[in-house]
């Protein structure tokens, strides 16, 4: 898959860095993957772009904000790298951003989450195509999952809309709640493939990679740098909600 190319510079983006705020993981590949993703966002936006983490992975938001302030930034946009409006998006992110702003003196603006909109449907379809998954294959859309029913419902709705685009069955499954990947795979007709709703490697993804290998099911990679245009879009939308002058 090709990497993002620089877009014509939007006058709103001048001197306003972007921070991608992810949950974090003990998986050793997370930091490098998110740094690569944010580098791609920086290429699109033409501004400094950094990854920060809520937990388990360094650096945290306060550290990244302090570094940007030391480099002369006065404000930054924080894009939560989350697909659903669950606990992390509604509680953790606002609290972390408030603490980071107070500690660094940086004006931090929270952008919309990545969500499960039509641009995410298009991204998933593109990822499936790039992974060589045939259009007629049914898909397991694998997400982290949440204790919040509405968040899981949003992923089920995303799967339903992806099914319309593909004209082949798509079912959602989760790493932390029902239905499990195996339960969904048992319901899907063959041929079947697995499509992770993950930006990077993760401990919750590793067992599904093993299931795919043992069962002979193709599995697409994490979304990675292909998600950069969506993050860039959330960044630009956030900037357009405030007066930067």
List PLM regions with ranges:
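Active-site-proximal alpha-helix that buttresses catalytic centers in soluble enzyme cores
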Residues: 1-245
